[in-house]
Amino acid sequence: VGYDYQARIHGMAEYDGRMYLTDWYNKSVQVFTPSKMEIVFGEETHITSDAVFKYDDIQPLGLLAYGGELLMSVQKSGKIQRYDPETGDLLGVLAEFPGKEIGRMEIARGMLYYIDLKAGKLMKAKGE
């Protein structure tokens, strides 16, 4: 399976039979179907190379399905956003960890764990 698409996929999560992908290059969350990738959040842009590394609150990285919504980490912000996979709406900030760059996230035994890309460490959200 191959696609002619300029995506920079970082995170992915399965929700309700669909695969959601974070694409920081195109500033979007996308849903994967067998025939194509459809944008479900963000803006579809063809960013020139001088804007690729512009970091703002709409460049998603990590993605985790949890409790009927998706949790999404935002590049260089230390924020975990709540995201409604049915509507594409951001539901607000779930947590903020100043000075951290949150990548992949997982839930284990009721606790949120994430990779701090800046420090290169696995972190436990509660009791840090």
Tell what function each PLM region has:
Residues 2-15, 52-67, 97-110:
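Beta-rich, blade/repeat-based domains predominating
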Residues 1-3, 38-55, 89-95:
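A short beta-strand motif characteristic of beta-propeller blades
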Residues 12, 21, 32-35, 41:
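Solenoidal tandem-repeat scaffolds enriched in leucines and small polar residues
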Residues 33-37, 84-88, 126-128:
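Short loop/turn segments that connect beta-strands within beta-propeller blades
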Residues 100-128:
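Blade-level signature of beta-propeller repeat domains, shared across WD40, Kelch, NHL, RCC1
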Residues 21-27, 72-76, 114-120:
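Conserved beta-strand positions in repeat-built beta-propeller and related beta-rich domains
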Residues 26, 36-37, 47, 77, ...:
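Short coil turn/linker residues within repeat-based beta-strand modules
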